[in-house]
Amino acid sequence: MDAIFDRVVREFFPNTTIPFWKKWLFRTAFGNKVFSRLIYNERLVNKNGVEWVNAVVELLELKCESEHHQFNNIPEHGATVVISNHPTVIDGLSLIHTVSRVRSDIKIIANHVLPIIFPQVSELTIGIENMAGKMSHKKFREMNDHLRKGGVLIICPAGKLANWSLSGLQEHKWNPGFLQLAMRNNTALVPIHITGANSKIYYLTATFWRQLSNMMVIREALRHHGKTMKINIGQQIALSSFKEYNKDLSAAANVCLTHLQSIAKNGPAMLDTIAPQELEPGKEELISAIEECEILRQFEDGRKLVIYRCNTNRTSPIIDELGALTRTLLSRYWCRNW
């Protein structure tokens, strides 16, 4: 763990000699012991990528609540840019966990230190050194390549956590880079609003000493144990909405932020939106029927053993789905062996 801590310190303070007292303070804030308990938890061993993220969410008993119908706003396939506000240190986990219910081809723009601390998410992250500044051409190309392959790219355009003020959390100004990516690749643009907050100690530390608050991320994440994150998945924003801004992407990015904050409060949309495609016929009933099943056992890897009690007096979406899957598998088998 000391090796990871030392590397994190070098990344945050390159070519700098850190005094003993300051390094001791950083080590205390980082929390090697709590970090070890998390990273070596048996429920996370041999897991990577989305599977690891979902296991961490389950381990923390973190509840990411979204309205069921809102998942229709995330396209099932095709290039997609997801934009979100950034109130807490675990927004990335919450966003990946939420989007992964629809898509698996996910990458997220994150601080370059994240995959150093958690190598399990390296396949999901595109690391940026200056999150609030301009990105390198290499990283921009990596994002474009992922979108050209039809993947999902998650971005918090503020680039850093919201500040605490007397009037509440204040989101930083959004970097318009996400608009360049969306328009260049003609992607779906999905806004997601997260309702949550870090501890007041964290915000106070960030106000007076940002470097120390950066080292508190692990401890702060664990403080969200058992909490609920309200995730509001908005309708896709039509890219045609930005034509009137005459290439003033900074102004367009500001409107996107205003739009997100408005729909989070059930206010009016500030931009044109695209109505979601409905789920396939019967899928909503199928999902509802599965959720009503009795859980017999919860496995450590997140899987569940459930029992379904069929009411023979009415049609069963689960039996219908099993029948459809059986027919599909048999037809594929006979085609291969014809």
Where are these regions (language model features)?
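Pre-Walker A (Motif I) flank of P-loop NTPase domains
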Residues: 76-85, 151, 155
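Conserved N-terminal entry element of GNAT/NAT acetyltransferase domains
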Residues: 274-313
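Non-catalytic C-terminal accessory region of glycerolipid acyltransferases
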Residues: 2-5, 137-285
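Catalytic core of membrane glycerolipid acyltransferases/transacylases, capturing the structured
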Residues: 32-37, 80-134
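Hydrophobic beta-strand scaffold residues
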Residues: 64, 106-108, 153, 189
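Membrane-anchoring hydrophobic helices of lipid-metabolizing enzymes
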Residues: 1-80, 90-94, 101
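A conserved beta-strand-loop-helix scaffold within acyl/acetyltransferase catalytic domains
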Residues: 299-338
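Short, flexible loop segments at the rims of nucleotide/cofactor-binding pockets, characterized by
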Residues: 57-63, 85, 129-134, 167-168
